[in-house]
Swiss-Prot record:
SUPFAM superfamilies assigned: ClpP/crotonase
An annotated GO BP: fatty acid biosynthetic process
Catalytic activity, reaction form: N(6)-carboxybiotinyl-L-lysyl-[protein] + acetyl-CoA = N(6)-biotinyl-L-lysyl-[protein] + malonyl-CoA
Disulfide bonds: none
GO CC list: acetyl-CoA carboxylase complex
All copies of domain CoA carboxyltransferase C-terminal, residue ranges: 32-289
Pathway, per record: Lipid metabolism; malonyl-CoA biosynthesis; malonyl-CoA from acetyl-CoA: step 1/1
Keyword ATP-binding: yes
Family: Belongs to the AccA family.
Species in which this protein is naturally found: Staphylococcus epidermidis (strain ATCC 12228 / FDA PCI 1200)
Annotated function: Component of the acetyl coenzyme A carboxylase (ACC) complex. First, biotin carboxylase catalyzes the carboxylation of biotin on its carrier protein (BCCP) and then the CO(2) group is transferred by the carboxyltransferase to acetyl-CoA to form malonyl-CoA.
Protein name: Acetyl-coenzyme A carboxylase carboxyl transferase subunit alpha
Length: 314
């Protein structure tokens, strides 16, 4: 339960208590239950339509929030995962493969968090090593060769900052991805489904279209990290989240992303199938638009999109 959900939790407890009492004591409490359920519905709508940036950060980090592998079966047909970077090893934090979207052969790449402690250790909490980014680039170049559109799912706190990752060229692998993705001649569409953290997100995020789920975040650093750097106090993370403009609506206003995908009330985890179908609908919409561009226009469109970010109006 998140802090802002406490009032809803209290109402649910009262409803459960009345239902238990009604069943146990064989008394009619249905009117009271109906009133509380109506109140819960109103309060739920009120809470989730007035979320603050820090509230959305907490939702984006929920362990039960759907991951890349949760969404893929709903969106793509006959998905086959491909492994390895052909240089060092396979990275379970970065998954990729080929499948079909509406009958069209496509390449799918995404960061993958774990579902529990054991899985998170295996997936390195969704923080990819250099070999993960090199695997992603290998699949992107393969997609370009066979003229397959590329879809990426961004869901990471950032690239793994460990000693071994740095020794194997973490910054180089991300930098190369940025360079190569900028010139790909096939459509590239990215969606931020949870946290989009720093260069770890950008390593698979240089795309013609950047979409975000309503309660996802996209930033150069976490609110805690920003607060610690700017004010020497990570406890000021809530203020940092407000200041940094990391939510989907803020980034849409700033022109950083192209579209916000609505979530079920309460977050994507409330109905992952409905959420997945919403993502699929947006994928098809933007893919149909990008199909009108030539290979050269696709590369130029992508380059210009990111070239304009951060421009200053005097």
């Amino acid at each position: 339960m998140l802090d802002f959900e406490k009032p809803l939790f209290e109402i649910r407890n009262k409803i459960d208590s009345l239902k238990e009492s009604q069943e146990k004591n064989e008394v009619d409490l249905q009117d009271e239950i109906d009133m509380l359920e109506a109140s819960l519905k109103r309060e739920t709508t009120k809470v989730y339509t007035n979320l603050k940036p820090w509230d959305r950060v907490q939702i984006a980090r929920l362990p039960e929030r759907p991951t890349t592998l949760d969404y893929i079966p709903y969106i793509f047909d006959s998905f086959i995962e491909l492994h390895g970077d052909r240089s060092f090893r396979d990275d379970p934090a970065m998954i990729g493969g080929i499948g079909y979207l509406d009958g069209k052969s496509v390449t799918v790449i995404g960061q993958q968090r774990g579902k529990d402690t054991k899985d998170n250790i295996y997936r390195n909490f969704g923080m990819a090593h250099p070999e993960g980014y090199r695997k992603a680039l290998r699949l992107m170049k393969q997609a370009e060769k066979f003229n397959r559109p590329i879809f990426t799912f961004i869901d990471t706190k950032g690239a793994y900052p460990g000693k071994a990752a740095e020794e194997r060229g973490q910054s180089e692998s991300i930098a190369k991805n940025l360079m190569e993705m900028a010139s790909l001649t096939v459509p590239v569409i990215a969606v931020v489904i949870g946290e989009g953290g720093s260069g770890g997100a950008l390593g698979i995020g240089i795309s013609n279209r950047v979409l975000m789920l309503e309660n996802s975040t996209y930033s150069v650093i976490s609110p805690e990290g920003a607060a610690a750097l700017l004010w020497k106090d990570s406890n000021l993370a809530q203020i940092a989240a407000e200041t940094m403009k990391i939510t989907a609506l803020d980034l849409l206003d700033l022109g950083i992303i192209d579209e916000v995908i609505n979530e079920p009330l309460g977050g994507a985890q409330k109905d992952e199938e409905v959420q997945a179908l919403s993502i699929k609908k947006m994928f098809l919409k933007h893919l149909n638009e990008l199909k009108q561009l030539t290979p050269e226009e696709l590369a130029n469109d992508r380059f210009e999109k990111f070239r304009k970010i951060g421009s200053v109006v005097e």
